[in-house]
């Protein structure tokens, strides 16, 4: 028993990109076999926010299977300040998507199993120092803005701003723009280890630097949450024949902790 918890794919970017100042990160996710239980599932693209003085924090955006929302489908863009900045939830804008006042990070979004969705994090065109996440249905090519986060601002300043910002009338946050680092994708699952198997597919992992150069990881390294910390022994990550990466629950584990999976 226990929770399937978290398993991650850390991107191994080419050596020439490791010191690049990243300003955009993208990944495509597809829910191939959707959940069949009411537990929460979250499939996300994660980045660190880095400024001149070090790390500001991290953010994650992705699709959720969440029974609080119509059809159990939702999207999220949220994150936390770094420990030396207090570790608080990062402030951000009010989304145009429907949601709940007590959780501005998670919004209703009608994703469907078997469709491909591109997750994208980039500098906000509306607010200086903010980072925007959007999701695009690859069949319709329709992008949907989720919201903006302000990782570089003091949390106390933006906590007030968060509740009054609306698209089109925001004042500039005024933070230094910073850049992105350490991209990864992951699954976080709050189901039992023995619940019906779920499969998601990741592809088109891409990072773009401030010179406009697009970088693809050479490989990913696999990480599983330890069983003693609530992880399951029957989660797995494996490549497919189309160049994608599958994350699967309730299956045999073919790629162990720390394994590398080449992408070229």
Question: Locations of the language-model features?
Answer:
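Short, solvent-exposed beta-strand-to-loop segments that form ligand-recognition rims
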Residues: 135-176
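Long, compositionally biased interface segments
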Residues: 212-264
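Short, aromatic/His-centered strand-loop micro-motif at the edge of beta-sheets
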Residues: 92-118
């Amino acid at each position: 028993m226990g929770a399937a918890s978290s398993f991650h794919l850390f991107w191994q970017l080419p050596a020439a990109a490791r010191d690049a100042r990243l300003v955009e990160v993208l990944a495509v996710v597809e829910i191939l076999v959707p959940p069949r239980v009411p537990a929460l599932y979250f499939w996300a693209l994660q980045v660190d926010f880095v400024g001149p003085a070090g790390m500001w924090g991290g953010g994650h955006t992705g699709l959720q299977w969440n029974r609080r929302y119509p059809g159990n489908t939702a999207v999220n863009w949220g994150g936390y300040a770094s420990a030396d900045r207090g570790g608080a939830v990062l402030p951000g804008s009010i989304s145009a998507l429907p949601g709940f006042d007590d959780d501005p990070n998670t919004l209703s979004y009608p994703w469907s199993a078997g469709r491909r969705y591109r997750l994208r994090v980039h500098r906000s065109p509306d607010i200086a120092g903010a980072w925007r996440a959007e999701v695009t249905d690859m069949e319709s090519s329709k992008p949907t803005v989720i919201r903006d986060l302000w990782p570089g601002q003091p949390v106390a300043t933006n906590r007030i701003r968060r509740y009054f910002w609306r698209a089109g009338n925001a004042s500039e946050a005024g933070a230094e723009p910073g850049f992105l680092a350490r991209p990864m994708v992951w699954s976080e699952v709050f189901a039992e280890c023995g619940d019906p198997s779920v499969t998601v597919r990741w592809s088109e992992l891409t990072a773009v630097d401030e010179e406009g150069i697009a970088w693809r990881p050479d490989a990913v390294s696999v990480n599983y949450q330890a069983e003693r910390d609530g992880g399951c022994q029957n989660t797995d990550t494996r490549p497919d024949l189309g160049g994608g990466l599958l994350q699967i629950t309730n299956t045999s584990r073919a790629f162990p902790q720390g394994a590398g999976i080449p992408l070229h």
